[in-house]
Amino acid sequence: MHLLIPAAGSGKRMGSGHNKLLLNVLGQPLLSWTVQAALASQSIEWIGIMGQPYDFPAFEALLTPLHSPKPVQLIVGGDTRQQSVFNGIQALPPGAKFVLIHDGARCLATPDLFDRCTEALQHCQGLIAAMPVKDTIKIVNADGWITDTPDRQGLWGAQTPQGFDVALLKACHDKGKQEGWEVTDDAALLEKCGQPVKIVPGEDTNLKITTPVDLAIAEFILGQRSAKSA
């Protein structure tokens, strides 16, 4: 399985002023934890990391001590996640049939989640890891008034990895560029193209590290895991 990791974010909501994936988490850059989980996966054979060239020296520095037995390629990302993934697709090795896409900021994903998504992708053309929402969701208008309360039973919170047939994903990205679609994940492109996307149960701990509170939670969970494996 081939894996693409968008890692070109600026970390504005983290208040760091630079790429949040380079923030220190228990002595290692956040991105390092994400890559280590992918390397520990039995199914991942190749990894592409999309980022900005000025971050490449830092990426190379965090990759060196990992001594990856699998190829890891740095790919120039775009101004948006959608553009970065498009660039990553173009850089896939010839013959790549399927691809997983995983947010660099989801450093708590386990190797098992990558492997379960890989297995599920053998039986569909598109999937996402997701979890049923636990909170009641309110739809609110621009003035702050609740307009609806959707049935929670049918609501799932999207995570990554998301997995796709490469040829289909390329076609949907091309269609998106032609139509000017702007989406926040690749599953939405398939949806707009009328293609079905399957849900694979994600993980409660698979948080996207976006705020300082998220970072503190990640440090706690990774610390607990490290203690158990010691």
Swiss-Prot record:
Top-rank taxon: Bacteria
SUPFAM superfamilies: Nucleotide-diphospho-sugar transferases
Broad enzyme group: transferase
A GO-annotated cellular component: cytosol
Pathway: Isoprenoid biosynthesis; isopentenyl diphosphate biosynthesis via DXP pathway; isopentenyl diphosphate from 1-deoxy-D-xylulose 5-phosphate: step 2/6
Function according to Swiss-Prot or TrEMBL: Catalyzes the formation of 4-diphosphocytidyl-2-C-methyl-D-erythritol from CTP and 2-C-methyl-D-erythritol 4-phosphate (MEP).
NCBIfam families: ispD (TIGR00453)
PANTHER family: D-RIBITOL-5-PHOSPHATE CYTIDYLYLTRANSFERASE
Protein name per Swiss-Prot or TrEMBL: 2-C-methyl-D-erythritol 4-phosphate cytidylyltransferase
Annotated organism of origin: Synechocystis sp. (strain ATCC 27184 / PCC 6803 / Kazusa)
Source taxonomy: Bacteria, Bacillati, Cyanobacteriota, Cyanophyceae, Synechococcales
Gene designation: ispD
